[in-house]
């Protein structure tokens, strides 16, 4: 029986009866068999019993929590059953050794930029991002690498106006909170991407708090931020372009006031459905010679990083080939 991601988009209570979880809300009680749950995303006020937490811990199921704005709040991260002291030491070594960290940081930006270029090529948009990317060669500090990444993404966001209809104009990137519809979609999607990467990292032996491009910090899984950069263009952004251009998401799917713009319940449900559909979409892997889902690609990326820090094979960031 294949497992899948579950998304709780309304207020409710998670209860346990034997080995079945029930989500109870104003619409009734819905059974969620534990052997079908891969991970869970919870939006809104969710009450969870200790019995549910115990079962999720036993089965190794992470739960990701998001706030009113759709921002990631935190995760229930089950006790790690795949701990590796050797890997932890190697991960830390590649952060502490500046030359090793700088190399990985540049590779994450290179992978993200090349996927951005693939997206822009799909929409036949000429750009100067490739020229900006060459500046990585001269970058000798992590802050300089981050600066290159920031300028690439800023230029990339300018081209959103060429892909999307006028009512979804970017007008600059705004985050907390987003001030217009396109910024709302980007923030919502990026939060989902971050949580998806956390899930995949949980299923490897990698420590999610040791990162290379982003600074390791308290209260965040910074390695998930590193890996998210590679997949945001080909998962989150493509979902946004599809939903908006197909008019599956319109102005009616947002709550707007003077201070912020947020997806309403209907808009969130539409986005989540398409995002999950994208994660489950399979493509034929040119190296493996078989079909893999986008969700699996994230896990494979983590495995590649693991091989790199062990010195088994140089890390080569994933770049879409279509």
From Swiss-Prot:
Cited InterPro entries:
CRISPR-assoc_Cas1, CRISPR-assoc_Cas1_C, CRISPR-assoc_Cas1_HMARI/TNEAP, CRISPR-assoc_Cas1_N
One GO MF annotation is:
DNA binding
Cofactors required? Mg(2+); Mn(2+)
Keywords annotated in UniProt: Antiviral defense, DNA-binding, Endonuclease, Hydrolase, Magnesium, Manganese, Metal-binding, Nuclease
Matches recorded under CDD domains: Cas1_I-B (cd09722)
Q: Which GO terms fall under biological process for this protein?
A: defense response to virus; maintenance of CRISPR repeat elements
State whether keyword Ribonucleoprotein applies. Answer: no
Q: Which domain of life is it from?
A: Archaea
Q: Which Gene3D superfamilies match?
A: CRISPR-associated endonuclease Cas1, C-terminal domain, CRISPR-associated endonuclease Cas1, N-terminal domain
Residues recorded as binding Mn(2+), renumbered to this chain, are 149, 214, 229
Q: Report the protein's function.
A: CRISPR (clustered regularly interspaced short palindromic repeat), is an adaptive immune system that provides protection against mobile genetic elements (viruses, transposable elements and conjugative plasmids). CRISPR clusters contain spacers, sequences complementary to antecedent mobile elements, and target invading nucleic acids. CRISPR clusters are transcribed and processed into CRISPR RNA (crRNA). Acts as a dsDNA endonuclease. Involved in the integration of spacer DNA into the CRISPR cassette.
Q: Which family does it belong to?
A: Belongs to the CRISPR-associated endonuclease Cas1 family.
Record's subunit section: Homodimer, forms a heterotetramer with a Cas2 homodimer.
Protein name stated in the entry: CRISPR-associated protein Cas1 1
**Can you name the source organism?**
Methanobrevibacter ruminantium (strain ATCC 35063 / DSM 1093 / JCM 13430 / OCM 146 / M1)
What is the gene name? cas1-1
């Amino acid at each position: 029986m294949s497992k899948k991601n579950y998304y709780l988009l309304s207020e409710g209570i998670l209860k346990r009866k034997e080995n079945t979880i029930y989500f109870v809300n104003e619409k009734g009680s819905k059974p969620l068999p534990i052997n079908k749950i891969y991970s869970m995303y919870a939006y809104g006020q969710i009450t969870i019993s200790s019995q549910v937490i115990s079962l999720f811990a036993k089965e190794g199921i992470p739960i990701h929590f998001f706030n009113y704005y759709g921002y990631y709040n935190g995760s229930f991260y089950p006790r790690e059953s795949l701990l590796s002291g050797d890997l932890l030491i190697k991960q830390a070594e590649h952060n502490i050794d500046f030359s090793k960290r700088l190399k990985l940081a540049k590779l994450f930006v290179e992978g993200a930029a090349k996927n951005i270029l693939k997206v822009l090529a799909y929409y036949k948009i000429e750009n100067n991002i490739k020229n900006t990317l060459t500046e990585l060669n001269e970058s000798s500090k992590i802050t300089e690498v981050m600066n290159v990444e920031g300028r690439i993404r800023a230029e990339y966001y300018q081209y959103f106006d060429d892909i999307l209809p006028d009512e979804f104009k970017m007008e600059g990137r705004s985050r907390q909170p987003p001030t217009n519809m396109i910024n709302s979609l980007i923030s919502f999607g990026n939060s989902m991407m971050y949580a998806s990467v956390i899930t995949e990292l949980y299923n490897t032996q990698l420590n999610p708090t040791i990162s290379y491009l982003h600074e390791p910090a308290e209260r965040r899984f910074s390695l998930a931020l590193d890996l998210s950069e590679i997949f945001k263009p080909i998962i989150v952004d493509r979902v946004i372009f599809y939903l908006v251009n197909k008019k599956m998401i319109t102005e009616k799917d947002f709550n707007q006031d003077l201070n912020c713009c947020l997806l309403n319940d209907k808009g969130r449900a539409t986005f989540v459905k398409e995002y999950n559909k994208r994660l489950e979409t399979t493509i034929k892997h040119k190296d493996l010679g078989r079909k893999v889902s986008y969700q699996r690609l994230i896990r494979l990326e983590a495995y590649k990083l693991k091989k790199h820090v062990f010195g088994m094979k140089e890390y080569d960031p994933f770049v879409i080939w279509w």
